[in-house]
Each structure stands twice: as C-alpha cells, then as structure tokens.
C-alpha cells in the first residue's frame, strides 16, 4: 500500500467550480498507486483551453487542445526521487466531454487522472494491444473507486 502521497494540485483555470476537491483527488491517487510501497509525488495541473492548446502544440505538434497530457519525470540515474511527473488536465475539455457524452463529472475526472497516471508509469495506447491493456487497467481502477463504468471504456 502507498505509504504516502504528495499531491501538488495546481488550479490555474479561470473558473474552478466543478473541479473535484483536493481530498477526493488524493483518494483517487492513493487507489491508483495502491500496490506501490514507496512514497508517490506528482503534480496535477488543471488548466484552461488556451494553455492546453499551447502545451499540445509545443510538446506533441498537435494544433488542437486535448483532455489530458502527462509529463513523466525522468531523473538522472544518480538521483533518487519519488517524483513521478506532471498531469495536465483541461477543465473546458472535460466539461465539454461530460455534456457531449452525458457523463457523471466525477467519473470523468477520475478517469482522466487514472489515464494520466498510467502514462506516468510508462503505459501508452499507441498500438491496439497496448490500448486494450491500458483500457482494462483504467476500467479496473474505476471500479475500485466505486464507479460501475466509465465514459470511454
């Protein structure tokens, strides 16, 4: 079980209404990293669409915003750290997807945090086989959080 979770939650969007509470997000993080025996440290940055548009363009060369981006921290081999990296979530995209797909807000927020966390751990969805594994892991974690299903799974 995770001995300690250090969550740096950065709310840098104009309107923070509808964002899950810090303690709820921390609970989700603890469930995601339940089997880890070490201290976990990560940043979750919740941004407006303009920042996400810039980040997606700057780092991935894509000219549109996305719902979540992950930036794993890869320290030099001689440095020991509990820092996993950063997850950036776009509030407006999450809200749009909630309305479009008639999704309960907390489930979608949890899903994006799970998705971003799995990327920090090295999982991806580039090929179909990896996408299936990642989707199965996401659904399993969603269920451990007490939700029956998830938006895109």
From Swiss-Prot:
Keyword Zinc attributed: yes
Report any one BP term from Gene Ontology: rRNA processing
Record-listed E.C. numbers: 3.1.-.-
Q: Where does Zn(2+) bind?
A: 115, 119, 125
Q: Which organism is it from?
A: Blochmanniella floridana
Q: Report which superkingdom the organism of origin falls in.
A: Bacteria
According to its UniProt entry, the function of this protein is described as: Single strand-specific metallo-endoribonuclease involved in late-stage 70S ribosome quality control and in maturation of the 3' terminus of the 16S rRNA.
The protein in question is named Endoribonuclease YbeY
Instruction: State the needed cofactors, names only.
Output: Zn(2+)
């Amino acid at each position: 079980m995770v001995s300690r979770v250090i969550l740096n939650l950065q709310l840098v969007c104009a309107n923070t209404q509808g964002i899950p509470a810090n303690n709820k997000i921390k609970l989700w993080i603890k469930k995601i990293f339940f089997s880890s025996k070490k201290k976990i440290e990560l940043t979750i940055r919740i941004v407006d669409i303009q920042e996400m548009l810039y980040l997606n363009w700057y780092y991935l060369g894509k000219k549109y915003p996305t719902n979540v981006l992950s930036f794993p921290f890869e320290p030099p081999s001689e440095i020991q750290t509990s820092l996993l990296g950063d997850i950036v979530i776009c509030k407006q995209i999450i809200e749009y997807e909630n309305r479009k797909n008639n999704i309960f807000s907390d489930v979608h927020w949890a899903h994006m945090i799970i998705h971003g966390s799995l990327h920090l751990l090295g999982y991806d969805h580039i090929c179909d086989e990896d996408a299936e594994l990642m989707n199965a892991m996401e659904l399993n974690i969603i269920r451990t959080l007490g939700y029956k299903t998830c938006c895109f799974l």
